[in-house]
From Swiss-Prot:
Gene3D superfamilies the record matches: 3.30.70.330
Coiled coil segments of this chain: none
UniProt gene name: rpl23
Sequence similarity: Belongs to the universal ribosomal protein uL23 family.
Keyword Ribonucleoprotein: yes
Native source organism of the sequence: Caldivirga maquilingensis (strain ATCC 700844 / DSM 13496 / JCM 10307 / IC-167)
Function: Binds to 23S rRNA. One of the proteins that surrounds the polypeptide exit tunnel on the outside of the ribosome.
GO biological process, one term: translation
InterPro entries given in the database record: Nucleotide-bd_a/b_plait_sf, Ribosomal_uL23, Ribosomal_uL23-like, Ribosomal_uL23/eL15/eS24_sf, Ribosomal_uL23_CS
Protein name, per record: Large ribosomal subunit protein uL23
HAMAP family documented for this protein: Ribosomal_uL23_A
């Protein structure tokens, strides 16, 4: 795994906040060349959380968006708040 940060930005739309609250899921934008395994490893190491699942999609704008579901031991809203994003 590269030591470079792979998260381009966090998505903080109404839908993303709702997913964080109800499904404990972070929504992030990553480079298109990054795969699910790399995303999972990076999020676990960088934020010291346990990742259960990673789902990805390519948006109509050509960005790769990843939905990263955290274990119940970790709280997505709390993580976003600690990062100063909420």
């Amino acid at each position: 795994m590269s030591t470079q940060p792979i998260i381009t930005r966090f998505v903080l739309t109404e839908k993303a906040i709702r997913l964080a609250e109800k499904e404990n899921t972070l929504t992030i934008v990553v480079p298109r060349s990054v795969n699910k395994k790399v995303i999972k490893d990076y999020v676990e190491k960088a934020y010291k959380v346990k990742v259960i699942d990673v789902r990805t999609l390519i948006t109509m704008e050509g960005e790769k968006k990843a939905y990263v579901r955290l274990s119940s031991e970790n709280n997505a809203i709390e993580l976003l708040t600690n990062l100063g994003l909420l």
